[in-house]
Amino acid sequence: MSAVASSASPAPPSRSAGFAFILGAALSWSLAGLGIKSVPLSALSSVSLRALFALPVFAFVLWFRVRSDLPAVLRLGLSRWQTWVAALSYTFTMLSFVLASKLTTSANAILLQYTAPIYVILLSRPLLGERVGRADVLAVLGCFLGIGWFFLEQLSTSGRYGNLLALLSGASLGLLPLLLRRAEQPHPAASAQTRERLVFVPTVVLLLGNVLAALVGAPAALTGPWPGPVTWLWLAVLGVVQIGLAYLLYAAGVRRLRAVESLMLASLEPILNPLWAALGTGELPSRAALCGGLLILASVLSHGLHTTLRPKPPR
């Protein structure tokens, strides 16, 4: 979600529409757990076919926004190493999350992936030169305590592997906004036209990331069992709605709301995800998973509140 948000402009024309967009994005993202569990394919096949459905969404949006300038925008985006590293991070996030969802519960997969802000806090200074304060350290500590709570109960071997993959997915997801911010930073001598084109780098990253995801899983998709009609429907929902539509709604919503409001509303995703899975498959998260996840969410949200509401220094 951070990927598209980084390209959003800060002018909020309609707050009510902003609330609707963010809620719609959270609802769309939350379909991942149930959808992935409902697709009887290997993780690689699921990633590849889901990416194929997401590709036209991002391609159309990029074309619609830049039209005749599309070749120049693509050349600029693909010429930057940050674009490729960010796209690889995005692809790994997709693959590791799908694998984690098949090896552990949906609650563990989504809530452990939600530790992504930890890595943003830890790497902001070395990558972007941003100072890390006491509130940042406390938020990181709270998140790691929450992760420890996840592992409090005895888990099966497959559960441990799934949790590890979910943690790696969170790390790669946390790297994504940092790389995108680096990719969008223009050279001091860059022209106004180049600066305008850099705004579309996040969409280029998403487009490239889904191309890579489709290619990585293509051998498994071509040699594995052919999906039935219901499976194709779920793949379409995951690609078009859970990836494509969700990112577009979030991008529109963050333009209209304060950061803390967007953060609060988007946090419905990890709560709704295991609820959908419970309704669809009867899979219930453990008490330790719920408690640890709530501590992670509380740490992330309190950090967002502190950052947004603290007094601004006088100019």
Predicted regions and their residues:
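Hydrophobic/small/kink-forming positions within alpha-helical transmembrane segments
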Residues: S30, A87, T91, L95, ...
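Specific transmembrane alpha-helical segments of multi-pass solute transporters/efflux pumps
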Residues: S28, R65-A107, Q113, W149, ...
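Hydrophobic transmembrane alpha-helices of multi-pass small-molecule transport proteins
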Residues: F58, V132-L152, S169-L173, N210, ...
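Hydrophobic alpha-helical transmembrane segments of multi-pass integral membrane proteins
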Residues: S16-F21, S45-F64, A139-G142, L165-L168, ...
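Glycine-/small-residue-enriched transmembrane alpha-helix faces in small-molecule transporters
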Residues: M1-S48, S96, L145, L155-A190, ...
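Specific alpha-helical transmembrane segments that line the substrate/conduction pathway
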Residues: S48-P56, V98-G129, S169, V260-A278
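Hydrophobic/aromatic residues within transmembrane alpha-helices
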Residues: V39, S46, R50, A100, ...
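Helix-helix packing/entry segments at the starts of transmembrane helices
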Residues: A109-T115, A183-E184, A189-V211, I243-L279
